[in-house]
C-alpha cells in the first residue's frame, strides 16, 4: 500500500515530542488503570528507577518517501548525522508505582514487517499467575490474552480460580471464555473473545471520547481522574529528564 504521509515537522522531536513522552502517555494510563483501578494516585506515589532513549535512523530517501521533501529542512539539521536523520522516537523506563514495579517501552521503526502494524506486548505478574498479551506472528498480529499460573500454585486450584473469574466476567461480557493453551502457545490458558467484543485499537479512541463527552454533559468526572492525570505526566517527565542525563 501507499506510505502514510507525514508533515516534515513530525520528525522534529522539539515540536512533536520524543517517543518516551508520546505513546508512553497511553501505556502509563494502562499501568494505573490495571494496577490501581479507580483509585486516586499522587505524583509522590511514582518513582522512576531507570530510563533511556535512542534514535531511529532515517535516510534521505526514507524521509522523502513519507514527507515528499527531497531534503531535510533547516530546523532538522541539528539532528542529522552522517547524512541521515536521527529521530529520538524510542524510549523505555522502569518505575515503582506505590508497591508495584512497571516497565514501559516504546519502539518506533520506520517500517513494520510486511503484514503487520502497531503491535503491543504486555505482562502483569502476580503472586498466583501472570497475564500476558502477545500480538506476534503466532497470533496473526492480533492481541491475545494468555494466563500462566505461578509455579507454587496448585493446578487444580488455579483452574477453579480461572473458571470462576471467567464466569464472573461473562455477566458483563457475554461470550468471553477460556481454553487450554497449546504447547506452542507457552501458557496454561488462552482467553477467547468473540469478534463483536474484539473492537480493536482504533475503537478505543471512540470509547475514550464517549467518556469525555459524558463527563462534559454531566459537569463532573470521577475524583481519581485529575490526580491520576497529574501523576501520569509527572511520571513521564521524571523518565524524560532521567533519559537525558549523562548525554
Question: What is the meaning of each model-derived region?
Answer:
Residues 1-84, 212, 246:
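Predominantly a Rossmann-like dinucleotide-binding segment in NAD(P)-dependent oxidoreductases
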Residues 15-44, 88-95, 99-103, 110-247:
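C-terminal helical cap and adjacent loop that interface with cofactors, partners, or active-site loops
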Residues 77-79, 106-110:
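Glycine-rich, charged/polar anion/phosphate-binding loops
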Amino acid at each position: 500500500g501507499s506510505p502514510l504521509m507525514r508533515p516534515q515537522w513530525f520528525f522534529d522531536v522539539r515540536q512533536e515530542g520524543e517517543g518516551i513522552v508520546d505513546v508512553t502517555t497511553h501505556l502509563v494510563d494502562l499501568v494505573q488503570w490495571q494496577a490501581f483501578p479507580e483509585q486516586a494516585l499522587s505524583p509522590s506515589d511514582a518513582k522512576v528507577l531507570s530510563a533511556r532513549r535512542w534514535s531511529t535512523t532515517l535516510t534521505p530517501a526514507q524521509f522523502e518517501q513519507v514527507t515528499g521533501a527531497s531534503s531535510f529542512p533547516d530546523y532538522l539539521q541539528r539532528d542529522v548525522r552522517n547524512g541521515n536523520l536521527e529521530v529520538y522516537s524510542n524510549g523505555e523506563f522502569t518505575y515503582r508505582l506505590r508497591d508495584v514495579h512497571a516497565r514501559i517501552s516504546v519502539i518506533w521503526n520506520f517500517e513494520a514487517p510486511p503484514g503487520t502494524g502497531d503491535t503491543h506486548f504486555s505482562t502483569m505478574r502476580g503472586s498466583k499467575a501472570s497475564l500476558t498479551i502477545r500480538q506476534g506472528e503466532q497470533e496473526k498480529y492480533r492481541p491475545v490474552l494468555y494466563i500462566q499460573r505461578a509455579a507454587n500454585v496448585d493446578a487444580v486450584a488455579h483452574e477453579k480460580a480461572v473458571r470462576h473469574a471467567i464466569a464472573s466476567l461473562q455477566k458483563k461480557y457475554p461470550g468471553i471464555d477460556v481454553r487450554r493453551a497449546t504447547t506452542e502457545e507457552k501458557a496454561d490458558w488462552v482467553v477467547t473473545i468473540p469478534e463483536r467484543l474484539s473492537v480493536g485499537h482504533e475503537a478505543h479512541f471512540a470509547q475514550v471520547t464517549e467518556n469525555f463527552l459524558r463527563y462534559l454533559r454531566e459537569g463532573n468526572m470521577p475524583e481519581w481522574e485529575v490526580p491520576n492525570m497529574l501523576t501520569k505526566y509527572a511520571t513521564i517527565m521524571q523518565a524524560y529528564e532521567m533519559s537525558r542525563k549523562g548525554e
